[in-house]
């Protein structure tokens, strides 16, 4: 266990150092700046028209949606190539021959993708809250920032584990499968009202945490009652958090079992 942890920390440190190259830093900044840029343009247009009625809540909603999109995109870029990048770099043979190296690589890349995606999400959230507060005067910006920071913390944790699992299962098509997972599970299944299956999705638990912690941030105040009629009252907050940890642990456990027991092809067949 100590060998795995030391190797994971070393791998995470190495991956984070690689993230500060010009290309990767540019991609990270583009992702982080996309939500606040869109919110700024929408807020500017609203201020010009002079109609701020109801837009404060809409600003929170559009911020949550855009930052969630950026969070998922960053996971696709950093978590899914965990095995393929080593195969492509011709380093898998060395990794496979070292004791505990496979698990260390998996955990290290998981930690790196978690840190990078959370940093991107947190920067985007901070800029969105500043813009919404200065230009629109939203209520309780500090509470909204703290609440959504917690939500994105758990989002990055769970999605990093899931996309790490996808990366070990589908080597060359991990990003495609990851995008399919987002559409099929987090958009379709999570939207099925008041059934047990949507509670197996990450979005359901994150959505409940966001509503409980940040308050109802949709434009229509009466829509909270309609939401509860459709999706039910939800679970206790501690249970939502516990299930998110369980999802991450199960995904990482399966990924660890696969990466240890599976034989990966390191050379192209002629």
Tell where the protein language model's regions lie, with residue ranges.
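Secretory targeting signals
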Residues: 36-85, 106-174, 236-237
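Terminal transmembrane helical anchor/hairpin motif
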Residues: 42-58, 169, 174, 179-265
């Amino acid at each position: 266990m100590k060998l795995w942890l030391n190797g994971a920390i070393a791998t995470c440190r190495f991956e984070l150092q690689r993230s500060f190259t010009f290309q990767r830093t540019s991609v990270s900044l583009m992702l982080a700046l996309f939500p606040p840029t869109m919110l700024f343009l929408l807020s500017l247009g609203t201020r010009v028209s002079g109609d701020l009625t109801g837009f404060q809540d809409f600003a929170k909603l559009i911020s949550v949606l855009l930052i969630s999109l950026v969070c998922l995109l960053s996971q696709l870029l950093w978590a899914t190539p965990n095995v393929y990048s080593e195969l492509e770099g011709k380093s898998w043979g060395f990794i496979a021959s070292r004791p505990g190296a496979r698990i260390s690589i998996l955990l290290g890349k998981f930690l790196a993708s978690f840190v990078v995606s959370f940093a991107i999400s947190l920067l985007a959230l901070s800029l969105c809250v500043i813009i919404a507060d200065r230009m629109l005067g939203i209520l309780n910006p500090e509470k909204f920032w703290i609440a959504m920071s917690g939500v994105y913390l758990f989002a990055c944790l769970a999605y990093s584990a899931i996309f790490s699992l996808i990366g070990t299962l589908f080597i060359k098509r991990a990003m495609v499968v990851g995008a399919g997972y987002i559409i099929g599970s987090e958009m379709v299944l999570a939207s099925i009202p008041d059934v047990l299956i949507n509670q197996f999705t990450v979005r359901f638990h994150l959505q409940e945490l966001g509503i409980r912690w940040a308050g109802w941030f949709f434009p229509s105040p009466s829509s909270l009652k309609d939401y509860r009629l459709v999706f039910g009252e939800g679970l206790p907050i501690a249970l939502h958090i516990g299930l998110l940890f369980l999802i991450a642990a199960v995904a990482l456990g399966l990924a660890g079992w696969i990466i240890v027991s599976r034989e990966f092809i390191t050379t192209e067949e002629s």
